[in-house]
């Protein structure tokens, strides 16, 4: 949102989007950026991704590795090509690295729209499409316009907005001013097509328990 700490939001974006080259189930898929900070956020994120060093993750200094296989890399490129063909601009990356067929450059897309695959499908790669929004209500509607519902993140310094948006988002996990959300003490799980039940925390025990109901009568005899 416009009132977010942009530096913190950029740090969270890098963590939630590009870790493991975008291949975790809680990686951010779409970025919704309010009009007032859209250009600044896009430029800053694009500049930040340029600092990544691609390569073998076991080597010192490498900050982003390859995708799991060439098929996955080709799928990610197809997302980028679809977006560009429909009017998106590439602010950073956007191509296969010369390191090999499984390496995709960390990518930032601007001027994206709902008719692009990056809006409705899981990218599972290092691509951040930046969608514009005007109002809080529009942001919530856009965020919920998906069949998935595992994790989401948002940045705002308005306490009232934090509660309104947090409650309005249809996701099992909501990161508020945080890009890393998982730990063993927190319930992990989603809604809609992102599954049922929870792992972690005391709620994660529920799937391993059986409830016994005992109906008693005549205990005074």
Q: What spans do the regions from the language model cover?
A:
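ALDH superfamily catalytic-core signature
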Residues: 1-113, 176, 220
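Conserved C-terminal structural/oligomerization subdomain of aldehyde/semialdehyde dehydrogenase
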Residues: 14, 53-54, 80, 96, ...
